[in-house]
């Protein structure tokens, strides 16, 4: 996949697996064009992603995207005061004349089939890019996403956060490779691995990732284990390690009882 370029579209700042997905991309030196953030506190999410990139030593454009239709009181659960630092501001807050949707569309025009979108949050940004320039978006290499459940009658979180956007993406001409929750929910770390993730030492980057992990875990019930759903998407982009079955996908939006399934 050496010719491929990737954009990571993420709701980093909720579940901790988004942070580890970005961590995996950084450590594997995945050819990321940039990161776009989505859903409710998109600006704060962008600051978290930007801080990770800065502490890692990577020059990586980060764009705050669309917040969606949900209310957004308060802050991301990982929000801390030091994210106010200008060094961690999203690029479209620091004078770069592009927003997340423009960035996706312009990348689609430039890279065509070599561009793959890694969607590990609600599909709001990607649907907006499709609606803005369907011609450019239809020419990209596809979407690898974490979202949905293709074995059970269940409305998965990323789909539920913007069901109309998911409908737009699934109804488009884009090739979609999806990791459903019925698969990703098996990617639970061991107790030993979790202790390491909670107590990383060394670089400021490792300490920050460990801090995010601890802040996230405080919001969970005792004994909660980390599940790295979103890492599977980035690993697939890096290693192409999974086999897939092709299915006909229909997202229900007519029935009140099965809406989003």
Enumerate the language-model features and the residues they cover.
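Surface-exposed loop and adjacent secondary-structure segments within mature catalytic domains
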Residues: 63-90
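Active-site histidine-anchored catalytic micro-motif
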Residues: 2-47, 51, 90-192
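Short, hinge-like loop/turn segments at secondary-structure boundaries
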Residues: 51-53, 79-81, 136, 195-197
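Metal-dependent catalytic neighborhoods of phosphoester/phosphodiester hydrolases
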Residues: 43-53, 72-75, 79
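Short, surface-exposed amphipathic charged segments that create phosphate/polyanion-binding patches used
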Residues: 75-84, 156-161, 194-195
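A residue-level signal for conserved active-site and pocket-lining positions in enzyme catalytic cores
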Residues: 62, 169, 234
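A glycine-rich helix N-cap at a beta->alpha junction
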Residues: 52-66
């Amino acid at each position: 996949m050496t010719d491929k370029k990737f954009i990571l579209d993420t709701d980093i700042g909720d579940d901790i697996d988004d942070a580890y997905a970005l961590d995996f991309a950084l450590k594997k030196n995945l050819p990321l064009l940039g990161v776009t953030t989505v859903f409710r506190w998109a600006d704060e999410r962008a600051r978290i992603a930007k801080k990770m990139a800065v502490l890692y030593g990577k020059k990586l454009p980060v764009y705050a995207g669309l917040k969606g239709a949900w209310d957004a009181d308060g802050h991301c659960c990982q929000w801390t005061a030091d994210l106010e630092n200008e060094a961690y501001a999203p690029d479209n807050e620091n004078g770069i004349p592009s927003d997340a949707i423009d960035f996706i569309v312009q990348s689609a025009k430039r890279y065509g089939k070599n561009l793959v979108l890694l969607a590990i949050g609600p599909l709001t940004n990607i649907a907006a890019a499709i609606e803005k320039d369907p011609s450019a978006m239809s020419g990209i290499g596809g979407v690898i996403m974490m979202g949905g459940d293709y074995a059970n009658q269940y409305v998965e979180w990323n789909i539920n956060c913007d069901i109309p956007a998911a409908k737009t993406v699934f109804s488009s001409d884009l090739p979609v490779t999806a990791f459903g929750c019925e698969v990703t929910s098996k990617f639970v770390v061991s107790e030993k691995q979790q202790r390491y993730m909670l107590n990383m030492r060394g670089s400021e980057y490792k300490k920050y990732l460990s801090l995010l992990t601890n802040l996230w875990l405080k919001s969970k019930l005792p004994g909660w284990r980390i599940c790295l759903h979103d890492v599977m998407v980035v690993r697939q982009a890096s290693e192409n390690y999974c086999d897939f079955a092709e299915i006909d996908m229909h997202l229900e939006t007519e029935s009140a009882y099965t809406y989003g399934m």
